[in-house]
């Protein structure tokens, strides 16, 4: 189907930006970086970043300018899943067919990996190659959507 082509391309773009943006597992602190990569790479449907690309394509936006917000949204999603899988939340053992971060590593590393993914998402947006006004709008939007008025608030209601 012709509509699948852009979705596959966009998913590959996000995977490539994640691969480039995340520190290698060999970079200190190795365990933390390995956990971050475990949480984000090689799995998932990438629905949220695909929505970013799809919305941008409606306005004719060059895909290169959408890489940062699409990848930041995926990092926030990964961070939320890492924290949601913790024993204090849902205590899930598997995510995307592999052990969750707290099972594959440990709880402390999972918490730090989630926190680091959240910080990395904001850093990626802050350094995006767009004008300052747009960067601030993206940062404000991501903070609102992931904070107490959004995802964190919803999780608080869930627990």
Spans of model-derived segments:
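N-terminal amphipathic/basic leader segments beginning at the initiator methionine
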Residues: 1-23
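Mg2+-dependent prenyl diphosphate-binding active-site environment of isoprenoid biosynthetic enzymes
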Residues: 6, 22-159
């Amino acid at each position: 189907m012709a509509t699948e082509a852009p979705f596959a391309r966009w998913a590959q773009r996000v995977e490539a930006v994640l691969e480039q943006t995340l520190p290698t597992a060999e970079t200190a602190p190795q365990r933390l970086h390995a956990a971050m990569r475990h949480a984000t790479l090689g799995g998932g449907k990438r629905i949220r970043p695909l929505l970013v690309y799809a919305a941008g394509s409606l306005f004719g936006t060059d895909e290169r300018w959408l890489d940062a917000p699409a990848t930041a949204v995926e990092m926030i999603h990964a961070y939320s899943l890492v924290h949601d899988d913790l024993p204090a939340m849902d205590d899930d053992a598997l995510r995307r067919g592999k052990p969750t971060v707290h099972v594959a590593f440990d709880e402390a590393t999972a918490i730090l990996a989630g926190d680091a993914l959240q910080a990395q998402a904001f850093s990626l947006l802050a350094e995006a190659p767009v004008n300052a006004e747009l960067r601030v709008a993206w940062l404000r939007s991501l903070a609102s959507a992931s904070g107490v008025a959004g995802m964190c608030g919803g999780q608080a209601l869930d627990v």
